[in-house]
Amino acid sequence: MNIYMTDEGKLLTEEQLKLVEAILVYTATEEKIEANSELSVTFVTNDEIQQINREWRGKDQATDVISFAMDELGEDEIDFELLEDEPVVLGDLIISVERCREQAAEYGNHFERELGFLAVHGFLHLLGYDHIEKADEDIMTKRQEEILHHFELYRGKL
């Protein structure tokens, strides 16, 4: 899987970026995602994610992660999955590094654990997981924890 990460504000260290990439590659492998799939991940500030949230979701507040799935076709859009040998574009993840730091402190987690959680959580949304219904939430939560535990990222381990 090809992952394109953007951190223009230099909000993360090289090690943290590599951790996110490793977590996403592992998740893609575990979820049996095609090798020619593509995903973009952008790391932003609270102000930047608030602007995106306002423009695209109509919510004028900062949030931790936003997922934009590419499989939701609009009118006159091409279904790229029908094009042989073309990469499967899964979508975009936008992660607020500031909100990640705030939540890590609030929940008593290492920053890297919260960062990994947000990456996995957003990615699983792109893959069709959801948490609106309790049963779906339980499935998604279990999957997230399995993936994070593989990287020894546990809750409340400061």
Curated annotation (Swiss-Prot):
Binds 1 zinc ion. GO terms for biological process: rRNA processing. SUPFAM superfamilies: Metalloproteases ('zincins'), catalytic domain (SSF55486). Keywords: Cytoplasm, Endonuclease, Hydrolase, Metal-binding, Nuclease, Ribosome biogenesis, rRNA processing, Zinc. Zn(2+) binds at H121, H125, H131. It is found in: Cytoplasm. The gene is ybeY. NCBIfam families: rRNA maturation RNase YbeY. Gene3D superfamilies: Metalloproteases ('zincins'), catalytic domain. Single strand-specific metallo-endoribonuclease involved in late-stage 70S ribosome quality control and in maturation of the 3' terminus of the 16S rRNA. Its main location: cytoplasm. It comes from the Bacteria. Belongs to the endoribonuclease YbeY family. This is Endoribonuclease YbeY.
